[in-house]
């Protein structure tokens, strides 16, 4: 569960990404590069899932169900996620795409009176067809470079947005002038 937000030792000057479903909402691409909040080592010690590795597929399991991303940074999560560590036969991109294609079945496993939630046990009961290694390798050779390009583009976009956020106020205030801008 989420370490107490009233305990400053868990949050103040935190250095570890702390993901909530809100961090995945509105994402154009399923890539988690950063989170709104950071958690400290002390806060991280209170979380049973610990710090999840890069490549973990995150699926919001409640409020709402179905936000997806691949963590591109080590990330701690709140209880609103199902985290899938992909260090075996199936790649992160394969698992992400399986989730997209299986979303109707995933949501069908939800229950709850106050709000719908997919429990980890009901999620685990969903069948996954694992293709032969030759097909999985072919899939990875085609899809992994495309996903890597998405990650690079997302990093570049974030970098350009930071430059814009620094330069625009300077341009508007006259602090920076562009020569020959006529």
What positions do the PLM features span?
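Juxtamembrane "helix exit" motif at the C-terminal ends of alpha-helical transmembrane segments
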Residues: 30-31, 174
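Short, surface-exposed loop/turn microsegments at beta-strand edges and helix-strand junctions
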Residues: 8-18, 31-39, 49-53, 67-79, ...
């Amino acid at each position: 569960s989420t370490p107490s937000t009233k305990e400053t030792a868990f949050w103040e000057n935190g250095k570890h990404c702390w993901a909530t479903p809100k961090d995945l909402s509105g994402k154009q691409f399923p890539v988690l590069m950063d989170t709104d909040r950071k958690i400290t080592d002390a806060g991280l010690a209170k979380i049973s899932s610990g710090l999840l590795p890069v490549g973990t597929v995150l699926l919001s399991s409640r409020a709402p169900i179905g936000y997806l991303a691949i963590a591109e940074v080590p990330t701690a999560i709140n209880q609103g996620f199902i985290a899938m560590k992909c260090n075996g036969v199936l790649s992160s991109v394969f698992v992400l795409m399986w989730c997209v294609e299986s979303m109707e079945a995933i949501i069908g496993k939800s229950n709850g009176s106050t709000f719908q939630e997919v429990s980890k046990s009901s999620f685990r009961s969903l069948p996954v067809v694992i293709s032969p290694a030759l097909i999985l390798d072919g899939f990875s050779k085609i899809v992994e470079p495309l996903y890597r390009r998405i990650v690079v583009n997302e990093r570049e976009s974030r970098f350009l947005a930071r430059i814009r956020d620094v330069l625009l106020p300077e341009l508007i205030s006259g602090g920076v002038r562009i020569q020959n801008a006529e």
